């Protein structure tokens, strides 16, 4: 038997139900009633929006709540010149003060003392400097405030910035002056920037604050600081303090960044590090080179002088090298730890290897050998044309290992005089 509806002739629609509800609220089913109803709804939504923004302002500005980027210090000082280097004449006073006298020290649970950096500390104003007669205080603030300098002039922005670390504890004033003047002379010839920092400025950032053990990993810290100080620079050229730029007439653009020159200097199909199964690529796009770094005579990465682009790939490498886990890893390497870390990432990340040009030492860091530097026809560091040792006309002379030999001051001084004579 078919089921019949209980009520005949009655139909229900959403329109009739809506109309009954509309009438119960006191609105007539005409044009005026509809407008009145919509006006009330609009007013309610507006009031809700107004009070939600008043009591919950974070929801309105969530996309713009990030603090401005900064380096080690929050408060920065605009630099008037693209040549940023410290007051080297303060070396005698800094030696007298020692590193402990420059920072606040904190006693740790294990009884050790750590140097502490105050990133929020303000720089000493010109008025305060004029009123201060304490020479020690002025030198201390000059040391601490130097890291706050940033260059933001867009009309005179350098394409390349030469970066170097200097050490007031282990080097004498004369040697430091020669190193700094060498970088300034080279940069001025090619309209480059200069970014030189005291090594001791970065000690509070390190977990291991022993300078001798952590020196290599201060290099990526100063490079990252240079990238921030010169945000529009295309390339950062790091040159170790144990090296001199010998041929001041060679610019990176015409010398190393030229594809024809790079093709001659590029090491193709060779192990990334000694005895590695991972090799450099046979086919390399020169225009995509973001990192240019030499091998040493043993076939390992030489981080004493290299060029890195101030872009995504360059910053990715530097941020990787600044990771505390990597910095404190017990690298099993006979050379320096930084070179081992760079070699590691290049072997395991083919994308980054494809952006890295590993070149012969001669183009960036020719090794100086005093035994080859004899006066006469074969003098001036002649090395029978090999690609490892310094010859007259090379861009740079590296004195790598001079600290262990105790010959840094004499070798730097000797070669610096040759630059001045040329």
UniProtKB/Swiss-Prot annotation:
Enzyme class: transferase
Ranges of the Cytoplasmic topological domain: 1-31
This protein's UniProt keywords: Glycosyltransferase, Golgi apparatus, Membrane, Signal-anchor, Transferase, Transmembrane, Transmembrane helix
Intervals, Lumenal compartment: 53-422
Top-level taxon of origin: Eukaryota
Protein localization: Golgi apparatus, cis-Golgi network membrane
Pfam families (alphabetical): Glyco_transf_34
TM spans (from-to): 32-52
GO annotation (BP), single: cell wall mannoprotein biosynthetic process
Enzyme Commission number(s) of this protein: 2.4.1.-
Topological relation to the membrane, as annotated: Single-pass type II membrane protein
Note: Present with 3480 molecules/cell in log phase SD medium.
Family stated for the protein in its record: Belongs to the glycosyltransferase 34 family.
Complex formation: Component of the M-Pol II complex composed of ANP1, MNN9, MNN10, MNN11 and HOC1.
Role according to the record: Required for synthesis of full-length mannan chains. The M-Pol II complex possesses alpha-1,6-mannosyltransferase activity and is probably involved in the elongation of the mannan backbone of N-linked glycans on cell wall and periplasmic proteins.
Protein name listed in UniProt: Probable alpha-1,6-mannosyltransferase MNN11
Organism of origin: Saccharomyces cerevisiae (strain ATCC 204508 / S288c) (Baker's yeast)
Encoding gene (name): MNN11
């Amino acid at each position: 038997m078919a089921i019949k509806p209980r009520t005949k002739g009655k139909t229900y629609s959403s329109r009739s139900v809506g109309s009954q509800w509309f009438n119960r609220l006191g609105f007539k089913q005409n044009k005026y009633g509809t407008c009145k109803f919509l006006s009330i709804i609009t007013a309610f939504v507006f009031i809700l929006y107004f009070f939600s923004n008043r009591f919950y302002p974070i929801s309105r500005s969530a996309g713009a709540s990030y603090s401005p980027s900064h380096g080690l210090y929050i408060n920065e000082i605009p630099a008037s010149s693209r040549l940023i280097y410290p007051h080297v004449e303060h070396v005698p006073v800094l030696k007298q003060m020692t590193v402990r006298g420059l920072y606040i020290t904190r006693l740790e649970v294990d009884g050790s003392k750590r140097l502490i950096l105050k990133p929020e500390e303000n720089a000493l104003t010109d008025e305060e400097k004029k009123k201060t007669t304490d020479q020690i205080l002025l030198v201390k603030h000059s040391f601490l405030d130097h890291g706050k300098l940033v260059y933001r002039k867009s009309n005179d922005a350098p394409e390349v910035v030469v970066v170097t670390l200097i050490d007031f504890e282990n080097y004498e004033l004369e040697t430091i002056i020669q190193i700094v003047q060498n970088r300034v002379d080279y940069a001025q010839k090619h309209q480059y920037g200069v970014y030189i920092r005291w090594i001791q400025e970065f000690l509070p950032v390190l977990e291991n604050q022993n300078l001798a053990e952590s020196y290599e990993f201060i290099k990526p810290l100063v490079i990252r600081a240079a990238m921030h100080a010169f945000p529009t620079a295309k390339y950062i050229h790091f040159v170790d303090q144990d090296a001199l730029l010998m041929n001041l007439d060679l610019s990176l653009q015409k010398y190393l960044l030229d594809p024809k020159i790079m093709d001659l200097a590029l090491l193709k199909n060779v192990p990334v590090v000694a005895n590695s199964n991972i090799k450099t690529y046979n086919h390399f796009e020169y225009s995509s080179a973001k990192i240019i770094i030499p091998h040493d005579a043993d076939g390992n990465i030489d981080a004493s002088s290299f060029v890195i682009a101030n872009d995504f790939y360059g910053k990715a490498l530097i941020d990787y090298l600044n990771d505390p886990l990597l910095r404190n890893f017990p690298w099993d390497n006979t050379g320096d730890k930084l070179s081992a870390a760079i070699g590691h990432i290049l072997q395991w990340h083919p994308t980054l290897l494809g952006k890295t040009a590993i070149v012969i030492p001669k183009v960036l860091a020719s090794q100086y050998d005093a035994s080859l530097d004899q006066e006469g026809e074969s003098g001036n560091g002649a090395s029978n044309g090999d690609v490892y040792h310094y010859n007259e006309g090379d861009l740079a002379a590296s004195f790598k290992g001079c600290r262990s030999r105790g010959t840094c001051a004499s070798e730097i001084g000797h070669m610096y005089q040759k630059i001045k004579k040329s």
